[in-house]
Regions:
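ATP/NTP phosphate-donor binding region
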Residues: 1-91
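Glycine/threonine-rich beta-strand-loop-alpha-helix active-site module
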Residues: 75-127
Length: 127
């Protein structure tokens, strides 16, 4: 079954689904005035990663790849946060499965709210 029409759902998060919808990513990030993306993925060698990265760089945005190849550990998350901050990123994008998506969400949260993973997981720091 071919998907001929896409759809968009907006709750507290935005979900966009449909064929070739990745071409809308630069416009969405531009609307939010984002300039430098920490792009979390399983592999920077994925064709989809390369396509989206090209779309972003063609739109004048910088892309910092970050690979998450396993279930993310505290060290993987905190290292991603360190790269996000050191590189001056202002948003995350995730391409991959649950581990990649979860890692990108936590990296972004830590970059904005400060601290490390253990502060929230072990010491009860509120978001």
């Amino acid at each position: 079954m071919a998907i001929t029409n896409g759809f968009e759902m907006v709750f507290n998060r935005r979900l966009i689904f449909g064929e070739n919808k990745v071409t809308e990513i630069p416009g969405i990030l531009n609307w939010y005035n984002k300039k430098k993306v920490l792009f979390v993925t399983f592999s920077a060698e994925f064709d989809a990663f390369k396509k989206i990265s090209s779309l972003l760089t063609d739109a004048g945005m910088a892309v910092v790849p970050y690979e998450v190849k396993t279930e993310p550990t505290l060290q993987i998350i905190d290292h991603g946060r360190d790269i996000y901050v050191a590189e001056g990123c202002d948003c995350t994008i995730a391409l991959g499965g649950g581990s990649v998506v979860d890692a990108a969400k936590v990296i972004g949260m830590l970059a904005v709210n400060g601290g490390d993973t253990e502060d929230y997981q072990m010491r009860g720091k509120a978001v």
